[in-house]
Every structure is written in structure tokens, then in C-alpha cells.
Amino acid sequence: MSSRPFESPPPYRPDEFKPNHYAPSNDVYGGDMHVRPMLSQPAYSFYPEDEILHFYKWTSPPGVIRILSMLVIVMCIAIFGCVASTLAWDRGYGTGLMGGSIGYPYGSGFGSYGTGYGYGFGYGYGYGGYTDPRAAKGFLLAMVAFCFIAALVIFVTSVIRSDISRTRRYYLTVIILSAFLGVMMFIATIVYIMGVNPTAQASGSLYSSQIYAMCNQFYASTATGLYMDQYLYHYCVVDPQEAIAIVLGFMVIVAFALIIFFAVKTRRKMDRYDKSNILWDKEHIYDEQPPNVEEWVKNVSAGTQDMPPPPSDYVERVDSPMAYSSNGKVNDKRLYPESSYKSTPVPEVVQELPATSPADDFRQPRYSSSGHLEPPSKRAPSKGRTGRPKRLEQDHYETDYTTGGESCDELEEDWIREYPPITSDQQRQLYKRNFDTGLQEYKSLQAELDEINKELSRLDKELDDYREESEEYMAAADEYNRLKQVKGSPDYKNKRNYCKQLKSKLSHIKKMVGDYDRQKT
């Protein structure tokens, strides 16, 4: 979709004018023609209604969070399997260390290198600032369990599309929980590295010399010929499954960091866009024909046929961001009351459409009872019928694409009569002054209209956060209804139409100036 529904008029850039030997000097233009370019930027040029966010897709930020949480679940299971497979070597199974060939002791904390070796060897490493391998593995398994539960909760709540997973508060909780688990998982992985690799923590330790002397035999390139105890071997050497667990631990940390990134991105989009712009479920375009169309054609006579819907109503339905979800309900709130589409139509032969063109002396085409389009006649537009309720503007923002093609052509003819093609530099300078004046008026008027739209969007988000019985909800609802009445007032509509008229005028002046500059060069 287009991200610029209410585009600003083309900017007038005096610096684009390239003077040559035919052009006059800068004195004709007041000496400031090339000093500072005049850029036209609308006050609120981006209209969020024109962009739809498909959050049900797996490539969207919530979808990426689901994928990452699923990967965390798989990696946690793999880490648990790798660490659990090495727990048997920490229980002291096996024979005495190196048999009885080496009988000298390595200190009371390590026990004796003889047949009397027992649990004192393992527990001795827990003292004197030394990390016990079993304690490191237990800490890592505990953090893996917490990460598994958290990732499972995130995945399940997002997959079942619960209401709580579609709020900004939910993603704030995901950010905080992921940050906490990521930090704790980083600490657990570092502790696990120190526990399964004793030489990594031996430097500066009380038992550094004994550990190096005991483990160097496993690092030597040639075998010593002695019988090695399997427990001591697995203690000194990092097993492949332990290395895999370390790598997966860091990958879990990276996954949590990415979850935080996409959760922040999701919250920003939810703050920026209206709820009606976000599709949490796969939409079904409501383009089916009315039910029992064939039966209706057979039974209804030509004289009593209902008139076809006016083009303005059709545009409102097509442009509306509302879509029906797969579970049969509307993705978001209803934009206008039920009475606006259940009112009893007043039968009449010819239906006049309300004028939406910026030109006040033109009217929209009308439809006869047979459904044929009658050519418009140039006369003052008549007021719309009071029996037919008129829908307010689409949600909070309007686009200017509902203007009829005939009125645009006729309005262009009016501007051509008022601003004919430029024939002299003095006339160009006059157009420049008119453009500057109109541009300032357009920006001021557009800023006033956009302020109402942004305030409505802000109140709409606040109403979703408040309880209906609270005083804050009632105050916000009153202000919301007041602004809706302001948008439905004739003064607002006149300003909006005049703003469109100014945009058309500025576009025409810009075109005339551009044509003249191209002819000069």
C-alpha cells in the first residue's frame, strides 16, 4: 500500500531554476532566489491508516518472536541432554586413580592418590574459591529449565492468539523476562565453562600446581602407559557434549537478545499505528456477493429495484481497514454505530450525493432509478437528505481519493483560467509569491486538521487501556466524542475541502513554473 495517502503539493524549489544568458539577474527576484530553497513538507504527512500490519505472518515481528521461542525450546532440550549425559562421571564411579603406582598425596583437600580415593576429590574442589563441576552443571540445568518454561509460555500464548498476547503490556513482560533470563543464562554458561575445564580456573588458585600436574598427562601428545581413571579423564578433558552445551548456551543468549529486539519493534508499531491497522488473524476479504442474488433478481421487479449503492459508500467500504478474521469476528473495533447501516432508506427516484469536491460550484453525478449514471449539471449542490445517515470520516484520518474525476478536471480548468501559462519573468515572480503565501496557509491549515486526527488516535489508544467503569475512561470517552463531533461539523469539512483546494492550486502553480523553467533552459 501507499504510505502517503494525503500527499503534499509538489515543493517549489527555486534552486532548481538554472539561469542562463536569457534569464534576468537576481535583482529581479529580490536577490534571494538562490539563497535558501523552499521545501514543502506536510505537517503530518504519514497517515497510519494507509498501512496494514500483518502480524499473523511468521515473517512479522510477532512471528519472528514465535520462531525464536521455538528455537530456544529446542536448544534447551539439547543442552539438558548434553549436560545430563556427563553427570555419571561426577558421582565418583570407577577404580582408584592410577592404581597404586603413585602414592604421594596432593593435600588433604584432594584426598590420596591411592585406592582410598573417594568423594573427597570432588568435594575438595568446592573449597578455596574452586568451582565444583557438579554445582556448575546443576546451576546450568536450573537456568535451562527456567528458559524452557519461559519460551514455552511465550510460544503457546502467541500461537493460540490469546487476547493477552495482543497488548503492549504483554510484550513489555516479554522484554523484561527475556533480559533477565539472558543475563542469568550468560552467568550460568560462564560458570559451566569454569566447572568443566579445571585448567581455565586453575590460574591463581590454591591448587593450581596440583591440578596442572594431575591433568598434564592427558594433554601430552604421547601416552604415559599408566592406567588412567575414567573419572579423572572426564574431569580434566572437556567432552564433546560439554562443548556442544557451551555453544548452545551462548546461542540461547543470542536468541533472547533477538526476542527483546523484535518485542521492542512490535511495541513501537503498536504505539504508532491504530488498532484497526493491525491484523492479528488472517483476513478474509469481504467481497462476496449478497446472499440469494439469483433469487433476488428473479423476484424483484424492475420498478421496485433498490438503487445501487452510491460510489462514496463503495469507496468507504473498500478503503476501510476493517477485515473479517478467520474466526468470524472483526479484527478490531467498529468504526461507526450500528444505526448508520441499519437505517430505513427513503425511496425516491433520484438520489443526490453530497458534494465532496473542493470546488463549491460543481456537484457529484447522480443515479436514476434504473441505475444509469446521469451527467452532472453545473448548479449549486443541494443538501443531502436527512433521512439517510451519513457516515463520518474513516476512523481518524481521511484521504482525498474520493473526489470525482469530473470535478478534478473541471477544477483544473478553473486553475488554468486563473493561472495561465507563464510568459514572462515578472509573471513567474508573481506566481512565486502566490505559491509562498498559499503554501504557508496550506501548512497551517493542514497542521490544525492533523492535530485533531492525532488527538483522536491518542484517545483511542487510551480507551483501550482504561476500564469502562473508571473515571479516566469516562473523561477520555467524552473528549473522544467531542472531537468526533468536531470532525463532523461543517466548519471542519469546509477546512478539509479548502485544504484540498489549496493543494490543487499549489500543484498547478508548481507545474506552470516548471514548464516555464524548462522552456527557458
UniProtKB/Swiss-Prot annotation:
GO CC terms in record: apical plasma membrane; bicellular tight junction; cell leading edge; cell surface; cell-cell junction; cytoplasmic vesicle
Region called Disordered, residue ranges: 301-407
Pfam families named among the record's database cross-references: MARVEL, Occludin_ELL
Modified residues (Phosphothreonine): 304, 402-403
Extracellular side stretches: 90-134, 195-242
Main location: membrane
Keywords: Cell junction, Cell membrane, Coiled coil, Disulfide bond, Membrane, Phosphoprotein, Tight junction, Transmembrane, Transmembrane helix
Compositionally biased residues, Basic residues: 380-389
Tissue: Localized at tight junctions of both epithelial and endothelial cells.
Cleaved signal peptide residues: none
Biased composition (Basic and acidic residues): 390-399
InterPro entries, alphabetized: ELL/occludin, Marvel, Occludin, Occludin_ELL
Role noted for this protein: May play a role in the formation and regulation of the tight junction (TJ) paracellular permeability barrier. Interacts with ZO-1.
Subunit note: Interacts with TJP1/ZO1. Interacts with VAPA. Interacts with CLDN1, CLDN6, CLDN9, CLDN11, CLDN12 and CLDN17. Interacts with PLSCR1. Interacts with LSR, ILDR1 and ILDR2. Interacts with TJP2/ZO2.
Protein name: Occludin
Protein encoded by which gene: OCLN
